[in-house]
Amino acid sequence: MAQLCGLRRSRAFLALLGSLLLSGVLAADRERSIHDFCLVSKVVGRCRASMPRWWYNVTDGSCQLFVYGGCDGNSNNYLTKEECLKKCATVTENATGDLATSRNAADSSVPSAPRRQDSEDHSSDMFNYEEYCTANAVTGPCRASFPRWYFDVERNSCNNFIYGGCRGNKNSYRSEEACMLRCFRQQENPPLPLGSKVVVLAGLFVMVLILFLGASMVYLIRVARRNQERALRTVWSSGDDKEQLVKNTYVL
């Protein structure tokens, strides 16, 4: 009887241990699933297709549109906004507790696309007029087609261009108003473009050269006059003065 009770207790203990292990595995799988499908950042991939997809931005708590290249993506990649919200709408940054470390490790192992550099991605950057307003418009190597605006420092106005979706620069704005607000009259004397700088430097060099040549000519003329005066004084000696005085006496 005692052996039977002991056997039952052992079975109950093993069943409890098994259920705990199973629940732990399921919880780990769920956390891993949440991480892979909702917490990682979007990945455009190395291919150059142009597929509209949705990804869950856990910081904003919303699903956002992006352009997928067609390969080397991750699980945070949905065909529709509804599918994205269904999977991740209730997920927050603190949903998985201490998964921040594992999330960073996973992000580093996923091949990521070149970081999009445009005017919307400068939350921690200091404003630099040359970087945000004088740089040329850059379409980039990707093949998406985003209408953007850039500031033309020579015309002091914002013009539209097509942004490919990757490897742009900071002089890229989603609206003309944002472009003008960022760059128009931000600097009373904005730095000149490289071509204008070369022209200005060349003009200054020519002016300095002309002034130097003019000063040299004036100096040489003065030296020549002084030498001529000294030569005349040497020829007209005191003996010549006496001879001239005697001639004048005889004439009188």
Swiss-Prot record:
Instruction: Write the record's keywords in alphabetical order, separated by commas.
Output: Cell membrane, Cytoplasm, Disease variant, Disulfide bond, Glycoprotein, Membrane, Protease inhibitor, Repeat, Serine protease inhibitor, Signal, Transmembrane, Transmembrane helix
Q: Which residues lie on this side of the membrane: Cytoplasmic?
A: 219-252
Which pairs of positions does the record mark as disulfide bonds? Answer: C38-C88, C47-C71, C63-C84, C133-C183, C142-C166, C158-C179
Q: Which organism is it from?
A: Homo sapiens (Human)
Q: Which domain of life is it from?
A: Eukaryota
Record's disease association: Diarrhea 3, secretory sodium, congenital, with or without other congenital anomalies: A disease characterized by life-threatening secretory diarrhea, severe metabolic acidosis and hyponatremia. Hyponatremia is secondary to extraordinarily high fecal sodium loss, with low or normal excretion of urinary sodium, in the absence of infectious, autoimmune and endocrine causes.
Return the protein name: Kunitz-type protease inhibitor 2
Chain ranges on the Extracellular side, renumbered to this chain: 28-197
Where do Polar residues bias regions lie? 100-111
**CDD domains the record matches:** Kunitz_HAI2_1-like, Kunitz_HAI2_2-like
Has keyword Transmembrane helix? yes
Chief location bin = membrane
Q: Where in the sequence does glycosylation occur per the annotation?
A: N57, N94
Q: Which GO terms describe its biological process?
A: basement membrane organization; cellular response to BMP stimulus; epithelial cell morphogenesis involved in placental branching; establishment or maintenance of cell polarity; negative regulation of cell motility; negative regulation of cell-cell adhesion; negative regulation of neural precursor cell proliferation; neural tube closure
